[in-house]
């Protein structure tokens, strides 16, 4: 029977939680040993509303280094809390409401925090398991799941029953060895990559997938060391695709082999983009669990009608310094989703734990980012804009999202001395907590090495709405707007209230900061 598995013991893999049986993970251990006591404060302790660890027992504070992010993450890994008392939990994995799925089960799944895809355990389609050899057969019909990607703004759903994806009816091939991937791509319409290890300098190349193909990651996908900034570990292209994972899978980017606190700004060579989606059309990427990527995670470019949903990105292992990072967090430039030159894209219902932009859009049109949970990074960003082959962003909505324990909340950044256009941007219903630098920031003096303090006006920024953006700062400025001469126009603020910062500065609009 095909079923939706929603069991709490699976959370450590789904969220890349620490092993409570490992003595090195004292925070996870105390939650496991004293789960009842933990549940009593986890019911109300969420990073979306807590900026100080008040009410947390001393033993938990000691084991978790008094860090809100560690406490909150461990609460998430503990499992579901009482819905009668809990505040809203981070965004969870859900299929877009407009995307039909195939189901053969009449069982009702119990809602949980991490609903996940479970591939078919039996099928009338041919099933071929192989290492380096496969049998070919005709592909089945294209997946209606993938073909139904929509540009309509999705409805936010934080926890709901989930129907597993059961394949597209064509040949299914299970790959357990890297050498078998290319043959499967050429011959199969359903491809399961099970516990695949990609050797050094070996890309998981999914650029020639059949139209309507499905790729399902199972077990643990791992990679050898490749010290090359031009190397992309996973590359995906195609039309009407479904890219997803089983309930217990994890894709591990081996970031610890590269992290040196410098990311792509220097230090050792490291893969600059972990997963590249390019020339992907009318497709769905759903329910992937990814951890420990070296630098940028998703590089999404030249796509059309693409939906990404239910994705958990966890790079929190890079928060701590290592021997190479000179006291700084080991991971750096660890953007979650970088989007460029894409049209009609939906990113929703996903969690990002990282050290840089949760989402960064540098070019594209008609993009919706909804129901995100962003922790530890640089917030929800437009930019940086300027100095690239495509420098136009038009029609972006960020909505119904939480940004916690991060450097920035809502950010628009344009490069000093460059040209481009940013228009029709909306931030609505965004909750901020523990923001250390800027709650809302628009700056036109940005450079990767540091802002110049002198804004330029080569990039126009017009028709920007901030609606119901609320929350608290742990320091820094609530608002910072630094526009070039005449380059900002028609900014509106409604229901905006950010507190806890100081020395706000806004040279636009004329009325000053909100």
Swiss-Prot record:
<feature type="disulfide bond">
    <location>
        <begin position="173"/>
        <end position="188"/>
    </location>
</feature>
<keyword id="KW-0961">Cell wall biogenesis/degradation</keyword>
<feature type="glycosylation site" description="N-linked (GlcNAc...) asparagine">
    <location>
        <position position="429"/>
    </location>
</feature>
<comment type="function">
    <text>Involved in maceration and soft-rotting of plant tissue. Hydrolyzes the 1,4-alpha glycosidic bonds of de-esterified pectate in the smooth region of the plant cell wall.</text>
</comment>
<feature type="glycosylation site" description="N-linked (GlcNAc...) asparagine">
    <location>
        <position position="490"/>
    </location>
</feature>
<feature type="glycosylation site" description="N-linked (GlcNAc...) asparagine">
    <location>
        <position position="322"/>
    </location>
</feature>
<dbReference type="InterPro" id="IPR006626">
    <property type="entry name" value="PbH1"/>
</dbReference>
<feature type="repeat" description="PbH1 7">
    <location>
        <begin position="456"/>
        <end position="500"/>
    </location>
</feature>
<protein>
    <recommendedName>
        <fullName>Probable endopolygalacturonase D</fullName>
        <ecNumber>3.2.1.15</ecNumber>
    </recommendedName>
</protein>
<dbReference type="Pfam" id="PF00295">
    <property type="entry name" value="Glyco_hydro_28"/>
</dbReference>
<feature type="glycosylation site" description="N-linked (GlcNAc...) asparagine">
    <location>
        <position position="366"/>
    </location>
</feature>
<dbReference type="InterPro" id="IPR050434">
    <property type="entry name" value="Glycosyl_hydrlase_28"/>
</dbReference>
<feature type="compositionally biased region" description="Low complexity">
    <location>
        <begin position="136"/>
        <end position="166"/>
    </location>
</feature>
<dbReference type="InterPro" id="IPR011050">
    <property type="entry name" value="Pectin_lyase_fold/virulence"/>
</dbReference>
<keyword id="KW-0325">Glycoprotein</keyword>
<feature type="repeat" description="PbH1 1">
    <location>
        <begin position="280"/>
        <end position="302"/>
    </location>
</feature>
<keyword id="KW-0677">Repeat</keyword>
<feature type="disulfide bond">
    <location>
        <begin position="358"/>
        <end position="374"/>
    </location>
</feature>
<keyword id="KW-0964">Secreted</keyword>
<feature type="repeat" description="PbH1 6">
    <location>
        <begin position="422"/>
        <end position="444"/>
    </location>
</feature>
<keyword id="KW-0378">Hydrolase</keyword>
<feature type="repeat" description="PbH1 4">
    <location>
        <begin position="364"/>
        <end position="384"/>
    </location>
</feature>
<dbReference type="InterPro" id="IPR012334">
    <property type="entry name" value="Pectin_lyas_fold"/>
</dbReference>
<keyword id="KW-0732">Signal</keyword>
<feature type="active site" description="Proton donor">
    <location>
        <position position="356"/>
    </location>
</feature>
<feature type="disulfide bond">
    <location>
        <begin position="483"/>
        <end position="488"/>
    </location>
</feature>
<dbReference type="GO" id="GO:0005576">
    <property type="term" value="C:extracellular region"/>
</dbReference>
<feature type="repeat" description="PbH1 2">
    <location>
        <begin position="303"/>
        <end position="341"/>
    </location>
</feature>
<keyword id="KW-0326">Glycosidase</keyword>
<feature type="region of interest" description="Disordered">
    <location>
        <begin position="312"/>
        <end position="335"/>
    </location>
</feature>
<feature type="repeat" description="PbH1 5">
    <location>
        <begin position="393"/>
        <end position="414"/>
    </location>
</feature>
<feature type="active site">
    <location>
        <position position="378"/>
    </location>
</feature>
<feature type="signal peptide">
    <location>
        <begin position="1"/>
        <end position="16"/>
    </location>
</feature>
<feature type="region of interest" description="Disordered">
    <location>
        <begin position="134"/>
        <end position="166"/>
    </location>
</feature>
<feature type="disulfide bond">
    <location>
        <begin position="506"/>
        <end position="513"/>
    </location>
</feature>
<dbReference type="InterPro" id="IPR000743">
    <property type="entry name" value="Glyco_hydro_28"/>
</dbReference>
<feature type="glycosylation site" description="N-linked (GlcNAc...) asparagine">
    <location>
        <position position="240"/>
    </location>
</feature>
<comment type="similarity">
    <text>Belongs to the glycosyl hydrolase 28 family.</text>
</comment>
<keyword id="KW-1015">Disulfide bond</keyword>
<feature type="repeat" description="PbH1 3">
    <location>
        <begin position="342"/>
        <end position="363"/>
    </location>
</feature>
<dbReference type="GO" id="GO:0004650">
    <property type="term" value="F:polygalacturonase activity"/>
</dbReference>
<dbReference type="GO" id="GO:0071555">
    <property type="term" value="P:cell wall organization"/>
</dbReference>
């Amino acid at each position: 029977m095909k079923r939706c598995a929603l069991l709490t013991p699976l959370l450590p893999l789904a969220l890349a939680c620490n092993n409570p049986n490992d003595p090195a993970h004292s925070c996870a251990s105390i939650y496991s040993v004293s789960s009842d006591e933990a549940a009593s404060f986890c019911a109300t302790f969420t990073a979306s509303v807590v900026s100080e660890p008040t009410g947390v027992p001393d033993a938990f504070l000691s084991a978790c280094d008094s860090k809100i992010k560690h406490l909150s993450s461990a609460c998430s890994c503990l499992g579901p809390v009482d819905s009668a008392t809990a505040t809203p939990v981070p965004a969870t994995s859900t299929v877009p409401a407009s995307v039909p799925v195939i189901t053969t089960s009449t069982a009702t799944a119990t809602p949980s925090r991490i609903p996940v895809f479970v591939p078919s355990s039996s099928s009338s389609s041919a099933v071929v398991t192989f290492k380096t050899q496969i049998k070919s057969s005709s592909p089945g019909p294209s997946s209606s799941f993938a073909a139904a990607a929509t540009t309509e703004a999705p409805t936010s759903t934080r926890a709901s029953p989930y129907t597993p994806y059961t394949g597209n009816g064509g040949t299914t091939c299970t790959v357990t060895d890297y050498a078998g991937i290319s043959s499967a791509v050429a011959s199969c319409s359903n491809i399961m990559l099970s516990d695949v290890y990609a050797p050094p300098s070996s890309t998981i190349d999914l650029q020639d997938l059949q139209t309507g193909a499905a790729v399902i990651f199972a077990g643990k996908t791992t990679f050898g060391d490749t010290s090359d900034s031009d190397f992309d570990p996973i590359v995906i292209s195609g039309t009407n695709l479904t890219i997803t994972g089983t309930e217990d899978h994890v894709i591990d980017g081996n970031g610890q082999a590269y992290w040196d606190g410098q990311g792509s700004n220097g230090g050792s060579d490291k893969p600059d983009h972990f997963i590249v989606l390019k020339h992907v059309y009318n497709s769905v990427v759903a329910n992937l669990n990814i951890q420990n990527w070296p630098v940028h995670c998703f590089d999404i470019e030249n796509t059309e009608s693409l939906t990404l949903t239910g994705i958990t990105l966890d790079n929190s292992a890079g928060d701590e310094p290592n021997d190479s990072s000179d006291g700084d967090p080991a991971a750096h430039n660890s953007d979650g989703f970088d989007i460029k030159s894409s049209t009609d894209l939906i990113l929703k219902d996903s969690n990002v734990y990282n050290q840089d932009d949760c989402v960064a859009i540098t070019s594209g049109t008609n993009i919706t980012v909804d129901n995100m949970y962003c922790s530890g990074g640089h917030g929800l960003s437009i930019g940086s804009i300027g100095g690239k082959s495509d420098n136009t962003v038009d029609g972006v909505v960020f909505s119904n999202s939480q940004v916690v324990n991060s450097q920035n909340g809502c950010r628009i950044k344009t490069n000093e001395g460059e040209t481009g256009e940013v228009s029709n941007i909306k931030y609505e219903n965004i909750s901020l907590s523990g923001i250390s630098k800027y709650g809302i920031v628009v700056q036109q003096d940005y450079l990767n090495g540091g802002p110049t303090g002198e804004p330029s006006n080569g990039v126009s920024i017009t028709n920007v709405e901030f609606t119901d953006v609320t929350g608290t700062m742990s320091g820094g400025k609530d608002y910072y707007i630094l526009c070039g001469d005449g380059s900002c126009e028609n900014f509106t603020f409604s229901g905006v209230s950010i507190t806890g910062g100081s020395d706000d500065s806004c040279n636009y609009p004329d009325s000053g900061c909100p």
